[in-house]
Amino acid sequence: MGILEVRGVTRSFGGLRALQDVAFSVEKGEIRAVIGPNGAGKSTLFNVMTGLLAPDSGEVLFNGERISGVPPHRVIRKGIGRSFQITNIFQRMTLFENVQTALFAKHGKSRNPFARSRAFPEIAGETLHILGLVGLDDRHETSASVLSHGDQKRLETAISLASRPTLLMLDEPTAGMSRFESRETVALLRKISTEQGLTLVFTEHDMDIVFGISEKIVVLQQGTVIADGTPAEIKANPQVRKAYLGEEVAE
């Protein structure tokens, strides 16, 4: 059994079926991409897997425990972290304060998220450690508002790591980045996965990144899984090439 199991998940919105009998498994330590055209159901699938939406049928298991329909805050406590396509950070706070606030919530000290570091030295140390994982520890007193888009995504990854996840879900981690920032982000994700033993599941439109970092790929089209396999298997799949990779392959 994988660390994450998606079993026959179906989800509709009114008369629109966003997901239809979606099923795949993610192994511990794996880097897994979920790809598909716009409207394929990727965001809906992520929302079901993280508790923001309940499936109409089917289930999601994490470490063998059913989590579909479980509130998002409980999903986080079970070990799943998530970052979003649009950065979700406090712009008026420093990098240190952003991560520290997430740690206060994790440790049940949310009553005073703006407390001075000396009041909770263990959290201060952990905050700097997490910022170090994403290469931002030397800028911990910088306001989040002045960060580049790429560094804001790094900060959001740090905030996600504050929940101490064993599985991290990333929605378009390189969206809006320059080519240089994208390469840096890919290197960062590889480093985090290796050094922290994290399982990564991500969506991404940049096929160079998808095929450069993924160990397994699941392909969605109109809410249905049309392929699931290694990058080599996905590239060679005629249905995928026709439905999604045509332009990229032609290049």
Regions found by a protein language model. Name each.
Residues 1-251:
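Glycine-rich phosphate-binding loops of nucleotide-dependent enzymes
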